[in-house]
Amino acid sequence: MSKSENLYSAARELIPGGVNSPVRAFTGVGGTPLFIEKADGAYLYDVDGKAYIDYVGSWGPMVLGHNHPAIRNAVIEAAERGLSFGAPTEMEVKMAQLVTELVPTMDMVRMVNSGTEATMSAIRLARGFTGRDKIIKFEGCYHGHADCLLVKAGSGALTLGQPNSPGVPADFAKHTLTCTYNDLASVRAAFEQYPQEIACIIVEPVAGNMNCVPPLPDFLPGLRALCDEFGALLIIDEVMTGFRVALAGAQDYYGVEPDLTCLGKIIGGGMPVGAFGGRRDVMDALAPTGPVYQAGTLSGNPIAMAAGFACLNEVAQPGVHETLDELTTRLAEGLLEAAEEAGIPLVVNHVGGMFGIFFTDAESVTCYQDVMACDVERFKRFFHMMLDEGVYLAPSAFEAGFMSVAHSMEDINNTIDAARRVFAKL
């Protein structure tokens, strides 16, 4: 047995499923998950000594690559002054100044510890601000594991939500309406059915949890217009896209202004950080200045703030996003060329430093139904064969891939060459 296999066997006796987040268990592709010893730049190194070109990037945060010296040094320096104070610090102010400068729609920002905390808190704030209970989310979009968000659509887009996890009371789920991504008609129908009851729409501006599905040109502006028409708030969940699709996020890339924005992943530079913020009048409703409660023992802790501040300063440097886009475009085009040579139908979506690989005969993938029609079994084989080639992709057909500026064009070309060999065997 490999060392990963031995560790996985031991872990399953002590940790549910052997992992601390379900997708890491390889249940979406089968087999034994890799246990990682270290990471540097664009590479992961497992406990058995094998190196992999990494396109997971810790599920998004590692936009600069692993073990970036600026972030590492910032963490070490901060740790020497103490790990957590439970009191305000100068770095929290500097971090808030930087975030609000980089994302102009955020007049104010509140730091939390995860993307789930950010979305959960933003929805609570939207409900408190509007005095309404219902929310709209989209089929195939994921906004963390808060009870009101673990909801699937019923038999039709306008049916009241049904829990898709045990432990979520139906009374919670009934306030969540699930519409179809990239389908404005379904959203208008929801508003027309509940014109005075919907507090907010929450949306991934690029859906990254049904692989990678960008918005159609009119979708996000259409959501903004509907929120304005019916008096609801628009929450853009940039936990995945923030600072990755563009410096000011996908909202800037697509030219839409939300009322609230949720951030995570990159904002922490590899440490557990989330944030939410937006319009000053909305944020003023948050405790302690307003009645909507939110708190956190480790929110804004000095280690995480130092890591995030260092990361965002590096991400804001000229050329970072041009490099991300160039590398991702080259990878997408190369994979499509290699698949075409082998006669394998493939769609590769990409925006900024995100991409998604779909084995499908369809010409495009724009919604959850399109994603579900893809060949998952072929993806599973592709994943394991690429792993054997030393390429680490997301171990699920429903997760986006992530590029970093630490990837070289040689890494990209080696990945395409590996895919060409794999496609020939699929």
UniProtKB/Swiss-Prot annotation:
Pathway it works in: Porphyrin-containing compound metabolism; protoporphyrin-IX biosynthesis; 5-aminolevulinate from L-glutamyl-tRNA(Glu): step 2/2
GO cellular component, one term: cytoplasm
Modified residue annotations for N6-(pyridoxal phosphate)lysine: K265
Listed Gene3D superfamilies: Aspartate Aminotransferase, domain 1 (3.90.1150.10), Type I PLP-dependent aspartate aminotransferase-like (Major domain) (3.40.640.10)
Listed Pfam families: Aminotran_3 (PF00202)
Keywords noted in UniProt: Cytoplasm, Isomerase, Porphyrin biosynthesis, Pyridoxal phosphate
Record PROSITE patterns: AA_TRANSFER_CLASS_3 (PS00600)
PANTHER family listed in its UniProt record: GLUTAMATE-1-SEMIALDEHYDE 2,1-AMINOMUTASE, GLUTAMATE-1-SEMIALDEHYDE 2,1-AMINOMUTASE 1, CHLOROPLASTIC-RELATED
Protein name: Glutamate-1-semialdehyde 2,1-aminomutase
Native species: Escherichia coli O157:H7
